[in-house]
Swiss-Prot record:
Reactions the enzyme catalyzes: RNA(n) + a ribonucleoside 5'-triphosphate = RNA(n+1) + diphosphate
EC nos: 2.7.7.48
Species: Influenza A virus (strain A/Chicken/Hong Kong/37.4/2002 H5N1 genotype X2)
Compositional bias per record (Polar residues), positions renumbered to this chain: 55-64
Renumbered residue ranges of the record's region Disordered: 50-81
Known role: RNA-dependent RNA polymerase which is responsible for replication and transcription of virus RNA segments. The transcription of viral mRNAs occurs by a unique mechanism called cap-snatching. 5' methylated caps of cellular mRNAs are cleaved after 10-13 nucleotides by PA. In turn, these short capped RNAs are used as primers by PB1 for transcription of viral mRNAs. During virus replication, PB1 initiates RNA synthesis and copy vRNA into complementary RNA (cRNA) which in turn serves as a template for the production of more vRNAs.
Entry's Gene Ontology BP terms: DNA-templated transcription; symbiont-mediated suppression of host gene expression; symbiont-mediated suppression of host mRNA transcription via inhibition of RNA polymerase II activity; viral RNA genome replication; viral transcription
Name of the protein: RNA-directed RNA polymerase catalytic subunit
Residue numbers spanned by region Promoter-binding site: 249-256
Domain RdRp catalytic, residue spans: 286-483
Length: 757
């Protein structure tokens, strides 16, 4: 019998069915090919929104720049980036008036952070534009390369290990007449293979020195590399995102630290909190508006959408905000914070890989790199691409486009939230001076606006005033995409509110299933996801039990570990059957060893090894948890690990799960194909970097880890630490005199070698 799906909804209130309309099952769409077109779209759109601004030329790089600040007031509803400085400053002043001391206190907190942050803060994050190689790299490698180049150019402040000192080097590097960098390149040769007698291509990796003059270096330092945003659901078109280089990152980090500190103190800010904490914060604002509007007032809520938030923001505006927020602070602090927006006002967008052409008839493919777009004949391109290139040409320098207005995605989320909240703050009656008033929530570009007034005309007037006030600071509320409802029903950052937040369970669908890390982690993550959804997302007991059974089934198929007494044949069944037969207590076998599943919704919080430990045969325990087992490259045993789970909205989030290290916690080896490419030198650097860091961690285990401050190098820190530890161990009798003498001798040798170097 076929089920008519509409019957499912007869008893379900509409708001609970919202999650079924979300595009969150199945694989998300990924982008293929280059992001060049999307980046050109972004650059062209951004300039279009600010087209009535003033054009100037950057004296250092020769880049043409458009400045829309204090431009004409809008005459229509088209999105525009003409923020008015005095309006922004006034909004800041009122925000401070409503929250006395907020800026002062946040500045003090940030100053402390600035003085304590180590440069390794910049190793967090994934792909980063590496200006030395002119392409993306893992953050740690990009930082190492930058520091290496700085040191070879006599910039050595960074050796203290403080981020602020590294930033001093960045500032100095911009004044240098030239910078010398080392680039990797590869040579290909055709040679005959001795064994097979076939011709093969041999690749060798070389390093060569290259000098960049001031202009070229500045362009690279100000460059944001662009990529296509992947796995974005519910969109027809892809869009470009940016990744800045190491010169910009440190400055951005400090600005965002200040803005985060301010956001934490603002009740309307949806950042930096998340999850249940965010829901509680939002519910408070709604409660406030509803209690005040009980009998006399109407209350309406707009589920807001802003048109092209980033592309209408302007770094010059952020500079004005920072100047105001830090106005009573010491000069060095104000200078450090103002550099990020200044660099963004002079930013260059790298256009990515360029275009790929193929000729069907001749079976030829050729890549047109972005550098060539400035002067290639446009007859090869289709109509829409031709228009894009024509428009962007005046802005091109060395394959990058000058992009002064606009912010690029995700750079100043916190600071732009402060700007948004400052407009929400103006809705208090003491500022509106009429019968209507508003409040709301802001989280980066997403907002919800609650307007109260005695009648419908008042509501309309309030919304209009909010809309116009936003226009004055470069925020464009979209009239097409925002909708208004009686307060009590709205959506904000994919949380649906209907007299309380409705669980939007479909959001979590992508994180169910087998992660593919290893047998041990996958089992743990799988049950933790189910447990967390029972706690946070209204996953009921029956559904959870079903999810668990599906997960175990999925897990067994993934790792081919069906129960030892099953009829299913896989490559592993022979071994698993043998194990099953020789095990006395079969309940003690892990699921990944063909054992039964003992999980139910009551014991999801217990790691499987612990759940079954008492049931295991002794020799099985010995094999399973044996750090000397030669077949396992062991991770050090940590009680809690972090997994990356993919919820449906927002970035991948980190989720803690209990980790018990067993022979199932293996780490897959790296794919060898990378070893034959030009990445090889980089890979070796990365491994060396990793080894040094691991060694350092051995000397300073996190429990006793007070970072050495003021010691000039890692080696010296480790040597002095080794001496102290050795003396303590010798005096307490833990090591013999000979061992103590040997350690001291090694330490002296290391110091001697450093002196000779």
């Amino acid at each position: 019998m076929d089920v008519n799906p509409t019957l499912l909804f007869l008893k379900v209130p509409a708001q609970n069915a919202i999650s079924t309309t979300f595009p969150y099952t199945g694989d998300p769409p990924y982008s293929h090919g280059t992001g060049t077109g999307y980046t050109m779209d972004t650059v062209n759109r951004t300039h279009q929104y600010s087209e009535k601004g003033k054009w100037t030329t950057n004296t250092e790089t020769g880049a043409p720049q458009l400045n829309p600040i204090d431009g004409p007031l809008p005459e229509n509803h088209e999105p525009s980036g003409y923020a008015q400085t005095d309006c922004v400053l006034e909004a800041m002043a009122f925000l401070e008036e409503s929250h006395p001391g907020i800026f002062e206190n946040s500045c003090l907190e940030t100053m402390e952070v600035v003085q304590q942050t180590r440069v390794d803060k910049l190793t967090q994050g994934r792909q980063t534009y590496d200006w030395t190689l002119n392409r993306n790299q893992p953050a740690a490698t990009a930082l190492a390369n930058t520091i290496e180049v700085f040191r070879s150019n006599d910039l050595t402040a960074n050796e203290s290990g403080r981020l602020i000192d590294f930033l001093k080097d960045v500032m100095e590097s911009m004044d240098k007449e030239e910078m010398e960098i080392t680039t990797h390149f590869q040579r290909k040769r055709r040679i005959r293979d001795n064994m097979t007698k076939k011709m093969v291509t041999q690749r060798t990796i070389g390093k060569k020195k290259q000098r960049l003059n001031k202009k070229s270096y500045l362009i690279r330092a100000l460059t944001l590399n662009t990529m296509t945003k992947d796995a974005e659901r519910g969109k027809l078109k892809r869009r470009a995102i940016a990744t800045p280089g190491m010169q910009i990152r440190g400055f951005v980090y400090f600005v965002e630290t200040l803005a985060r500190s301010i956001c934490e103190k603002l009740e309307q800010s949806g950042l930096p909190v998340g999850g249940n904490e965010k829901k509680a914060k939002l519910a408070n604002v709604v409660r406030k508006m509803m209690t005040n509007s009980q009998d006399t007032e109407l209350s309406f809520t707009i589920t807001g959408d802003n048109t092209k938030w980033n592309e209408n923001q302007n770094p010059r505006m952020f500079l004005a905000m920072i100047t105001y927020i830090t106005r009573n602070q010491p000069d060095w602090f104000r200078n450090v914070l103002s550099i990020a927006p200044i660099m963004f006002s002079n930013k260059m967008a790298r256009l990515g890989k360029g275009y790929m052409f193929e000729s069907k008839s001749m079976k030829l493919r050729t890549q047109i790199p972005a550098e060539m777009l400035a002067n290639i004949d446009l007859k090869y391109f289709n109509e829409s691409t031709r228009k894009k290139i024509e428009k962007i040409r005046p802005l091109l320098i060395d394959g990058t486009a000058s992009l002064s207005p606009g912010m690029m995605m995700g750079m100043f989320n916190m600071l732009s939230t402060v700007l948004g909240v400052s407009i929400l703050n103006l809705g208090q009656k003491r500022y509106t001076k009429t019968t209507y008033w508003w409040d709301g929530l802001q989280s980066s570009d997403d907002f919800a606006l609650i307007v109260n007034a005695p009648n419908h005309e008042g509501i309309q007037a309030g919304v209009d005033r909010f809309y116009r006030t936003c226009k004055l600071v470069g925020i464009n509320m979209s009239k097409k995409k925002s909708y208004i409802n009686r307060t009590g029903t709205f959506e904000f950052t994919s949380f649906f509110y209907r007299y309380g937040f409705v669980a939007n369970f479909s959001m979590e669908l992508p994180s169910f299933g087998v992660s593919g890390i290893n047998e041990s982690a996958d089992m743990s993550i799988g049950v933790t996801v189910i447990k967390n959804n029972m706690i946070n997302n209204d996953l009921g007991p029956a559904t959870a039990q079903m999810a668990l059974q599906l997960f175990i089934k999925d897990y067994r198929y993934t790792y081919r570990c069906h129960r030892g007494d099953t009829q299913i044949q896989t490559r592993r069944s022979f071994e698993l059957k043998k194990l099953w037969e020789q095990t006395r207590s079969k309940a003690g076998l892990l699921v990944s060893d063909g054992g039964p599943n003992l999980y139910n919704i009551r014991n999801l919080h217990i790691p499987e090894v612990c759940l079954k430990w008492e049931l295991m045969d002794e020799d099985y325990q010995g094999r399973l948890c044996n750090p000397l087992n030669p077949f396992v490259s062991h991770k050090e045993i940590e009680s809690v690990n972090n997994a990356v789970v993919m919820p449906a909205h927002g970035p991948a989030k980190s989720m803690e799960y209990d980790a018990v290290a067993t022979t199932h916690s293996w780490i897959p080896k790296r794919n060898r194909s990378i070893l034959n490419t030009s990445q090889r030198g980089i890979l070796e650097d990365e491994q060396m970097y990793q080894k040094c860091c691991n060694l350092f961690e051995k000397f300073f285990p996190s429990s006793s880890y007070r970072r050495p401050v003021g010691i000039s190098s890692m080696v010296e820190a480790m040597v002095s630490r080794a001496r102290i530890d050795a003396r303590i161990d010798f005096e307490s009798g833990r090591i013999k005199k000979e061992e103590f003498a040997e350690i001291m001798k090694i330490c002296s040798t290391i110091e001697e070698l450093r002196r000779q170097k």
